[in-house]
Structure formats: C-alpha cells, structure tokens
Amino acid sequence: MDIRKFFGVIPSGKKLVSETVKKNEKTKSDEETLKAKKGIKEIKVNSSRKEDDFKQKQPSKKKRIIYDSDSESEETLQVKNAKKPPEKLPVSSKPGKISRQDPVTYISETDEEDDFMCKKAASKSKENGRSTNSHLGTSNMKKNEENTKTKNKPLSPIKLTPTSVLDYFGTGSVQRSNKKMVASKRKELSQNTDESGLNDEAIAKQLQLDEDAELERQLHEDEEFARTLAMLDEEPKTKKARKDTEAGETFSSVQANLSKAEKHKYPHKVKTAQVSDERKSYSPRKQSKYESSKESQQHSKSSADKIGEVSSPKASSKLAIMKRKEESSYKEIEPVASKRKENAIKLKGETKTPKKTKSSPAKKESVSPEDSEKKRTNYQAYRSYLNREGPKALGSKEIPKGAENCLEGLIFVITGVLESIERDEAKSLIERYGGKVTGNVSKKTNYLVMGRDSGQSKSDKAAALGTKIIDEDGLLNLIRTMPGKKSKYEIAVETEMKKESKLERTPQKNVQGKRKISPSKKESESKKSRPTSKRDSLAKTIKKETDVFWKSLDFKEQVAEETSGDSKARNLADDSSENKVENLLWVDKYKPTSLKTIIGQQGDQSCANKLLRWLRNWQKSSSEDKKHAAKFGKFSGKDDGSSFKAALLSGPPGVGKTTTASLVCQELGYSYVELNASDTRSKSSLKAIVAESLNNTSIKGFYSNGAASSVSTKHALIMDEVDGMAGNEDRGGIQELIGLIKHTKIPIICMCNDRNHPKIRSLVHYCFDLRFQRPRVEQIKGAMMSIAFKEGLKIPPPAMNEIILGANQDIRQVLHNLSMWCARSKALTYDQAKADSHRAKKDIKMGPFDVARKVFAAGEETAHMSLVDKSDLFFHDYSIAPLFVQENYIHVKPVAAGGDMKKHLMLLSRAADSICDGDLVDSQIRSKQNWSLLPAQAIYASVLPGELMRGYMTQFPTFPSWLGKHSSTGKHDRIVQDLALHMSLRTYSSKRTVNMDYLSLLRDALVQPLTSQGVDGVQDVVALMDTYYLMKEDFENIMEISSWGGKPSPFSKLDPKVKAAFTRAYNKEAHLTPYSLQAIKASRHSTSPSLDSEYNEELNEDDSQSDEKDQDAIETDAMIKKKTKSSKPSKPEKDKEPRKGKGKSSKK
C-alpha cells in the first residue's frame, strides 16, 4: 500500500468535517460518513467550490499539498505558506459578532473516527520529529487562507490545527480549548521560524506569545484556581451537585458561592484571588484574544468540560496535593466555622453550596481499599472469636465475698475471655452485689472488664468515652474493697410505708372526734371510692333505724347500748376481715384497685388509658357511626378506635389484661358480665347469655338510699381467652361473636394471648387492637420489693431480679412463687432464689423453627443444657421435629470442623447416619405402635445430629420439603390409578404400564395437533380423547404428571385462543364413557354368617334376581341422569288443588 494514499485521506476527511459543520447539521447522513472513510477518488468528487477556486490560483502546489514527500522543494514551499497566516491574523480579528455565525467548533465535540485519526496521526508525526514535513501543517495553512477570505474569527483556523502529544501530556497550562490553541500555534511558529532563518516579524510574534504563555502559567498556578478545577471535576459525580444543576444553577453561581465561603474560611487568600481576577479581566492582550470568543464559550460548556479533563501531569499532581491540603484544613477549621455559623445567621445561606460539594469526597472515601481491608479484618476477628479458646486457669483464683449491694448503681461491660472465671459466672457475680451487666459500651458505663482476645471496637469506644478499663483482678479487687449500700428499693418502700402510716393516723383522729360526717364530705368520699360510700350508706341507714327504734328509751341507756353494740360489731368485723385477708392469695390480696396501680400502664398512651378513652366515648361514637362498618375503622387516621364496637386486648399471660378491663368498667360505672374459658360459649349459649345480660341490673345498687340513681343501665361484655373458643362446646362461637359485634348495642371487650392464632385473624378486623407488652424488669422489681417489705420478707434485689426473669416477667407467676418460697422462712438468699427460679422456670411454648435453631445452636445458649434438656427439644413436636433436623443440618457450619472441609464432610456423614437410624426407629414406632421407643428416636433424630453439627446456621431454618413431596406423591398415585381405570378398555394394562409407557406418548399425541395446526387441530384432539375415554380433567392430569424436573407443561405454552377453542369444542359435545361419573351406591343388607348354607344360597339367588331387576330399572342406573323436579308446581296442579279443596268442603 502506498503511504501517500494513507496520508491523503486525512485532510479530505477534515474538509468534510468543516463542510458539514458549516451547514449547521446536527446529524450526518450515512452516505457522507461512508464517503469520508473511502478512497481518494470519492473525496475529490465531494470537494467544495472554494477548494476548486483555491486550486486554480495555485496550480503548481496541487499534488504536493495533498501528498507527503521528503524533498527539499516541498519544505521551502511549506515554510512560505507558514509565514502567511500570521500576517493576515490581525485583519480577521476585527469583527466581534462573527463568532456566533462561525460554524467551526472544537474537534473534541465530534465523535467521528476521522477526527480521532487526525489527532493520532499528528501526535505520531511530532514524536518522530517530522512535524514540519507533515501534510497536516500544509493542509491547515491552506484552510487559514480560506478563512481569511471569508473573514472569520482568528481562533477558528487554530481550533482545527493539529495537536501534539505535548499539548495533552506536556507542560501546557490547564485551560479551555482556546488556551491549547495558543500553545499549539506558538510551537508551530517556533518550528517554522527555525528553518526559515528566523524572520524578524515571526520572532516578535513568538516573543509576545511566550509572554502571554508565561502570564497564563503564573495566573493558573494559583491555589484558588486549582481548587475551582477540583470542584468542577467533583460536581457532576455527586448527587447534591445534580440537584443544583436541575434547579438551574450555573457554574458562575457555584463559583460565586465558593468565593463567599472562602472569604470566611480563608481570609488570607482572598487578596490573591482578587488580583488574579483583575489580571484576567484587565490584561489588554487577553481582552483582544478572548473578546470574540466570550459568547461561544458560554454556549460550549460540554466541550470545555471535556477539555478540562485533559491536563498535564504536573497540574494533576498539584490538584491532588491541593485536595489533601484542603481536607486537612477543613478538618481543622470546621469547629471554628460551626461557631461562626451560630453567631452569624445571615451567612448561613451563602455557605450552603460549598458544604454540598465538600460532603462528596467523604462519600467517595467510604468505598476505598481501606474500607475493604477493614471489612476483611473484621471478618477475620469474627472467625477468631468463633474459634477462640475458653478460660485457661478456671477456678485458680479465689472469689472474694463483698459487702451487700456494694456494686449497686454501677454498670459493667465484659469483653474477651477471663482466665479464671467464665463469662456467666462473672455476670452473676456482678449481679449478686447489685451491679448491672450490659452488652455495649455507652456513656453510662462505669467499668469495662477486659480479658484475653477482647473486642477492639469496645476498647476503642471505652478509651474515647473515658470509661475505666479493668481486668479480672481489678473486678475481684473492686468487690473486695467497695463498701456496702442500702438498696434503693428498700429506701423507696420505707418512705412509702411512712406516708401511708401518716395518712392512716389522721383519719382515725377525725373519726373519733367527729362521728357525724357533713354531707359535703359524704359526696367527696362517694366520688373517690365506691366501696367506702356503700359502707357509709349502709351505716347511715342502720343508724336511722336505730334512732327511730330507741326514741322512747332514756338517753343514757341509748348511748350505752349504742357504744357496746358498735364495739362488738367493730371487733367482729375486724376479726373476720383479718382472717379473710390472711387466707387470700397474694395475687388477690395485692391486686390493683385503680388504673394508676397497674404495673406498666401509667403512660398517657398506654393500653389502659386508650381503653378508658375508647369506652368513655363508646356511646357517642356508636350513635354517630351506626351505618359505618366496623372493619373500615382500620384505615381511619385516628388511633382512638372510635369506629370499632369492640376492643381486643392481646398479650402474654400475667401482664394485667383482665384487671385492666374490669377496672376500666368500674371507673366508668359499667356493670359487666365476664365469660372465660370455663364457660360454654357456643353459638346458642352466647345468644341466650348476652340477651339476658342486657336486661340485668346489679343487686348492689338497691342497698343504697338513692336506689334509682345508683342502679346502672350501662352494661359491658368481657370475653376472656377468646383464642380458647374451640371444640364441640364452643362450636360457631367466633362467628357468632363477630355477628354480635356487628349489631351490638353494648361495648364488648375481648382478650387473648396469641393474636396470630388462625381463629383470631377474622376477629381482629372488627376490634380496636390493643397489644399489651411485658413490663420491664425494673418496673416489676419495684412493686415486688414493696410487697415483700409489707410481708416482712428479706430478699436482696439481685435475687428478686432472678425470680422475675425466671417467671418470664409474668407478674402473677412472680407473686405465686414469692408466696410459696417464703412460706417457711422470711429470708431468701441470692443463690437460693436463683436455684429456685431456675427450677421453677416458666415453660415457654416454642415453635418448630425455634426448636430447629436451638438444636444446632452453639455458645452460651446451649452450653449448660443437659442431655434431658436436649432431648426435650425433640418432644416439643416429635412428629415434625425430625423432619426439621433433616432439612436444616446441611445448612450448619459446625464449630468442630474448624473450617476444614474434610472434617465438615465427615461430620455431615455421621449426622446423616444418625438421622437414618432415627428413621428406622420411627418406622418401628408407627408400624408396631411401640411408643416406648420415642426416647431412643429423640437421641438418634435430634440429640446426636445436634451435637455433631453444633455451630452456626447460615440461613433461617427452612420448612421440611418432604411434606410437600409426600403429598404430591399420593396425589400423583391417585391420578395414575384413575387414568388406568378410564383407559382400561383400550390399553388393557396396569397402573405401572400406563405411567411408564403410555403417558408420555399420549401427551405428545394430544398436544402436537394443537401446536402444529392451531384451532384446526382441536377436533383431532377431542376425537383422540373420546377414543381413550378421557375426560377434560384427565387431559389436565396427563399434562401435570408427564412434565418432569419442574418444567412447564407443553399445553401451557399454547396460544390462549387455541386453549379456549379446545375447551369450547369439548364442552359443546356429549361424551360417552364406559364408567360411572357418579359414586355408586353401596349394596343392600348382607345376611349373617350363622345361617345355613342352603338358606344363604336361596337368599343369594333372590338378591341376584332383585339386583338384575334393579339394573334393568332406569331409576337405579348410575349412567342415566334423572331430571330434577322443579320446585314450582305446574299449571294443571295449580288448577287441581283448589278443586280438591272445594270438593272436601262441599262434602263436609
């Protein structure tokens, strides 16, 4: 290939680019791009008229300009051409508005391959040191002459000049496109003047350009300019900068905001920035060069951004240094700037934009190699935590005995492995003396107990917060030296008891001094407490009766009898009340008497207060919203439950649901009927009981004076333990309850433990949902300590803490345990309370997923579990627990393997063998009903696999897939049996043969006509089905069974129109089948075996004859459908009926 042809393509390509840009076409046609990439002959055809005119003026230089050569004559011609453009440059710089009409733009804006080749060729030629001989220079000189004739701006021919490698990677200044053009022009002139003998005019021009370049370099070495360029690079990458651009902010506004922020943060640098701006604006040389290109620069931001990316190595390194300085200076000045912002409110709006740009580097730094390395180290630390050893010198140090409550009020955090004590022992030791152990370090933490292989994050946080760090010996020394304290709970109870004793003393004095109470006090007392008001009313009525009765007696006798009678009655009442109180259980003795005394329900948004507000507004809301359905109240914006006619209190047992409901009704004056699990709550009984309760009145109201005013007409129904409404006795109870709620005229309060129970899900939509949570340990502890103080029990607070945790924060269970354990002795130690609470730990119902997780769990959760405890996990549900173990044991990473794959596989093999042995035991239990083997199955199916694979599960426990596969196996077996029966007259084969040989062929034969012919093949398929006596259900079953590996059936891929046509065609016709479509009735009575054989034969003959008659009868034929008689009588029957009546009446 001739190299001249290779270089001849480039200038013509450039000419084409200039022509298309001059026409202001946004998109180029495919023909022009193809022609630009083809040979020289096509390019000559596309040459413009200006080029032809120029060639006519210079006929001697035609071919030499197009093709490169190394001859000396061509060099001299190029030198002469190089001198022409500088002479004509000042002439073309006069017009200022031509810049808008100038079609020539910067080369980097176009995405054409020709321009890229031009740049590449230019850079290569300059590297070889032959830039003066290149054709690019000559072609550009030629274009400069054309531009002078058309009077274009001076920068337009320079924009099309070739750019060298030095312009991109050399010492050139970082600036927009016009700066590069200056640098390239300077180099071109310098090379040409060296060869032409250094003309005086060229030297002068070159000196001026050198001065301009030096000035540019000095201006652009400013730190403020480098920072602005860095911000320009960062802005489009950050999200916040995009919001600014969407809002319409220009680069100038960002730069202005930056300058304002810089005035506050960098006052010593503002002057240099101002000087540089003045130099840029007032230098005459820059004004002359950039006046014509100001408007074009505003419209070419995209090209300027591209050019800004191409910078020299020195400038890029300088930018990196500037960024580092900037970050360090921001870190130092940020606190000072924050203080200034508080003082100067006016400047807040100005400093917002720089903050947005400064936040972006922090986001970039988050995804860095340092972060990935940090994650790797954290993962390695976690792996080492899982495989770390226990205490090496267990029990080597003597544990001291400290004073009582010596650590009360102190909070500890334990990290690492303690050498002589296990973590649980250290925790119980701290709690024994009143301390508290938490999991994470916070400001409230007093001591961090650090051991071997401690957590780095906890130690760093403790050092940052100034928390004291001690070791194991420091903890023991702390217990040994700290003085004892009196418990804060005991102090609170003592003060409370003192207040109560003072209040009790003062009313007694008043009663003794003034026996008669004023009516105002009567009213206040009746408002405060209803029981006391009732007692007072009873006493008053008795006094009135006695006054009337003793009118005739003397005053002295009357007084003596009254005092003696009062003292006797008082003594009898006191004795009886004391006996009753002593005989009461603690749960009834200390049961709350008001809403304020319910533990954990003191807040304004507590469930008790919500229920009180709901019941108070029930009459108003029910009268207003009669037409609205209750279920739509779920979507109302209010949280007061005003649209619901019933409330549902759900929560764990022993948290005060029933107590709250009864106290709320008492406070608002509602009489209530309570139905719990001991009552029959079926559909019929609910109707009767609720209907009766609506018309009831309480007898208590008739004892008082104002019987009519005190009797309440407000009733409520309390349904306790709604989730227990099951079985035959309560059949239909939930549905009847929902019906009652829809049409009730009294409030209904329901209670349950398990809100997610299937029966409760339908009830939830009609009730105001109130979920009770377990009270905190501190809340329960305070109330229990006061009760213990009243009963004279001496229990340390840590012991009470263990009792509460052992009862799973069930207040009722805590009171029962206290009354039982303190029946013998009135003192209870910490160790005794912990042992008793562990023995009497409340059984918590666990689901199968929790059981599966706990079987394989490692660590503190299962460290102290005995063999019996591990086998008890199996007995939570012995029918499904083995399936959960078999499904999830492969998802466990065992600790015993230690990351070794071979050990892991060995453990998996041994666990699988144990599960197989458990399955053998299960088959013996189920087949021979040998239920005594269940403990052996627990060992094989649960305990052994759990011990071998004890570790950490990689995912949540999955449900056993065996259950779904087993049900589908039974279903498929029934389907194949039905198909074998239906096709038996055609195939004469067994169920296995049909499954193995017939089904796959039948599937293809039934689907093939529909896929190939479409709607036309429907009749063929229906005929084939009739041939084999197949129904529509059999067709679907064949498609389902014959598809393997979860692949979709071929029938599902058909066009819906074809499927619809097939269904219509099959349903249109009647299909005869040799088998009954309905269930055949069972045979009639069979004779007893005690009869004689002859008699049996006779009976059989009679039966056979009768059976033949029955078979012949149309009515008994199962293949013939009977017509159902219409319920409406026919016309003649209607006519006959009155005639019969008339006849009877006439006869009478």
UniProtKB/Swiss-Prot annotation:
Organism: Homo sapiens
One MF annotation (Gene Ontology) recorded for this entry: enzyme activator activity
Acidic residues bias locations: 1094-1105
Entry keyword annotation includes Ubl conjugation: yes
Biased amino acid composition, Basic residues: 262-271
Key word ATP-binding present: yes
Phosphoserine: residues bearing it: 69, 71, 73, 108, 156, 164, 173, 190, 253, 281, 283, 312, 368, 537, 1104, 1106
Motif Nuclear localization signal: where in chain: 1120-1124
Pfam family, one: AAA_lid_RFC1
Record family assignment: Belongs to the activator 1 large subunit family.
Superkingdom of the organism of origin: Eukaryota
Placement of covalent cross-link Glycyl lysine isopeptide (Lys-Gly) (interchain with G-Cter in SUMO2): 50
GO CC annotations on file: DNA replication factor C complex; Elg1 RFC-like complex; extracellular exosome; nucleoplasm; nucleus
The encoding gene: RFC1
Tissue specificity: Wide tissue distribution. Undetectable in placental tissue.
Cellular compartments annotated: Nucleus
Residues the record lists as binding ATP: 650-657
Modified residues (Phosphothreonine): 110, 161, 163
Complexes and interactors: Large subunit of the RFC complex, an heteropentameric complex consisting of RFC1 and four small subunits RFC2, RFC3, RFC4 and RFC5; the RFC complex interacts with PCNA and the interaction involves RFC1.
Domain BRCT intervals: 402-492
Protein name: Replication factor C subunit 1
Compositionally biased region (Basic and acidic residues): 46-56, 234-246, 288-308, 323-353, 362-376, 496-507, 520-538, 1130-1140
GO biological process: DNA repair; DNA-templated DNA replication; negative regulation of transcription by RNA polymerase II; positive regulation of DNA-templated transcription; telomere maintenance via telomerase
Linked pathology: Cerebellar ataxia, neuropathy, and vestibular areflexia syndrome: An autosomal recessive neurologic disease characterized by imbalance, cerebellar ataxia, impaired vestibular function, and non-length-dependent sensory deficit.
